[in-house]
């Protein structure tokens, strides 16, 4: 994200590669993580159900802990997603006893972005209506200057207030609340149907998912790109862009997940991907450490390299950080079952149990 603000347009091919990476993972990586969040809830809920225990209240406590972890992360990085997860995650214990059909219908309704459709219809029926600028812009303007200042505690204070409000309001204004809730429910359904457990037995399902997603993604991509030419009224354009960008990202996320499933089933692909398993097991630790290390590298309280590192250098920093984290994950898991933050979260979840 840093490079999209400070990269020089004169970098040509390097900048194009950055845009390619953003095209591949922007809005999709978070979607995959959201899917897995719902899937992990099912695993925990199901494991406790087998013991005759109701996991719902314990999960709400777990979400409260996640909220606190998100605040800690947000103190360093004003783009935290954990607080959003803690808020939206409340939907999981509310619907976990519903039938598959009811959960699927709810997931579809949420994915359709009903609030954005309401905004579009209102703007269409009221041609003189001009939507107010997103409130997140105010908090972004308040927060951004502190990122370059040397006062660490002033930055933390700004990030915890304006930074979190910016992140949450941006998420609301860009359909993330509804899409995240939908992905949570879809992840839970995948767990119920064991689509990630018996991969060979569900090969047809994943093949259909791949083909349908590719067929849907292509027209969605071009339609989204053409929206500014089709709708000059920004009050109509903005919600439509949110809606169809959400659909497009969901379709491409399904492509990535299906491709990953097929690679995992291949011997050569399995060997390569298996080496990344420790990184996934410590995803929370890696996410938090990326925020801490990244903020120190780029923000004013640390090395203040936000205006010095361009696309290529920032990409290099990301690769080096990933390699170091992967090595640490392999080393740590030789003697521990979970990462440090994962272990602390688990222990706090089951406190007084």
What does each model-identified segment do?
Residues 13-78, 82:
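Membrane helical hairpin/interfacial module
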Residues 208-264:
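Alpha-helical transmembrane segments and terminal signal-anchor/GPI-anchor hydrophobic tails
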Residues 240-248, 283, 306-326, 330:
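Membrane-interface transmembrane-helix boundary segments in multi-pass integral membrane proteins
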Residues 31-46, 83-94, 175-198, 248-267:
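Specific transmembrane alpha-helix
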Residues 109-186:
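Long hydrophobic alpha-helical segments that form multi-pass transmembrane helix bundles
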Residues 209-210, 264-293, 311-312, 337-349:
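Functional transmembrane helices that form membrane-embedded active or gating regions
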């Amino acid at each position: 994200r840093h490079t999209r603000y400070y990269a020089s347009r004169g970098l040509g091919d390097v900048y194009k590669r950055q845009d390619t990476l953003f095209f591949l993972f922007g809005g999709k990586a978070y979607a995959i993580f959201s899917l897995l969040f719902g899937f992990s809830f099912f695993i925990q809920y199901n494991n406790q159900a087998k013991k005759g225990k109701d996991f719902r209240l314990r999960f709400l406590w777990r979400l409260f802990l996640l909220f606190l972890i998100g605040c800690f992360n947000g103190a360093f990085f004003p783009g935290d997603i954990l607080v959003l997860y803690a808020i939206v995650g409340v939907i999981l214990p509310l619907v976990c006893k519903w039938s598959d059909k009811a959960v699927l219908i709810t997931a579809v309704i949420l994915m359709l972005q009903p609030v954005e459709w309401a905004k579009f219809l209102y703007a269409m029926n009221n041609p003189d209506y001009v939507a107010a600028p997103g409130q997140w812009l105010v908090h972004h303007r308040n927060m951004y200057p502190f990122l370059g200042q040397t006062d660490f505690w002033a930055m933390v204070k700004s990030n915890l207030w304006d930074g979190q409000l910016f992140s949450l309001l941006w998420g609301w204004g860009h359909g993330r609340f509804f899409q995240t809730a939908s992905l949570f429910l879809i992840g839970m359904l995948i767990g119920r149907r064991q689509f990630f457990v018996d991969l060979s037995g569900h090969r047809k399902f994943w093949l259909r998912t791949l083909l349908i997603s590719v067929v849907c993604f292509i027209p969605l991509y071009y339609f989204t790109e053409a929206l500014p030419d089709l709708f000059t009224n920004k009050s109509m354009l903005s919600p439509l862009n949110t809606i169809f960008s959400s659909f497009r990202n969901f379709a491409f996320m399904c492509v990535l997940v299906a491709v990953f499933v097929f690679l995992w089933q291949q011997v050569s692909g399995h060997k390569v991907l298996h080496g990344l398993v420790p990184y996934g097991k410590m995803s929370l630790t890696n996410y938090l450490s990326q925020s801490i290390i990244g903020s120190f590298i780029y923000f004013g309280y640390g090395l203040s390299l936000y205006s010095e590192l361009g696309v290529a250098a920032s990409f290099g920093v990301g690769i080096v950080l990933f390699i170091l984290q992967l090595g640490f994950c392999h080393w740590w898991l030789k003697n521990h079952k979970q990462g440090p933050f994962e272990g602390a979260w688990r222990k706090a979840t089951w406190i007084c149990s």
